């Protein structure tokens, strides 16, 4: 059984970082080494995010289809690009995005893709978080 925090760390956060890295590189013309400092990862990780090696492409597509998620990601990207750094505000917005994904139960789809034999009683616990 995977805990919600494991799902976030193994699937959700890499997908979100991939989206942010691609947006920062393409929309804001920021170099990989600068993006790595903003996201707190290595330059190699940023390269992998941009090339699609890290971050599940299907999950990325699903996240971007959600208008609220896409809007929140744009806000974070614009904040990172304007400050050219990771700030308490961008951290707060990233946490808010993860919390939204959990509270809107989008995380359940991710969980079901990782584990197909989830007990429905256990699954319903996320609704109470």
Model regions: which residues?
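Helix-turn-helix/homeodomain-like alpha-helical modules used for DNA recognition
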Residues: 71-129
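Short, amphipathic alpha-helical "recognition" segments used to contact nucleic acids or chromatin
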Residues: 13-30
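Short, Lys/Arg-enriched anionic-surface-contact patches
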Residues: 1-17
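Short alpha-helical "recognition helix" segments of helix-turn-helix
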Residues: 31-37
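Short Lys/Arg-enriched helix C-cap and helix-to-coil transition segments
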Residues: 57-74
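C-terminal flanking helix
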Residues: 53-54
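Short coil turns linking two alpha-helices in DNA-binding domains
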Residues: 40-42
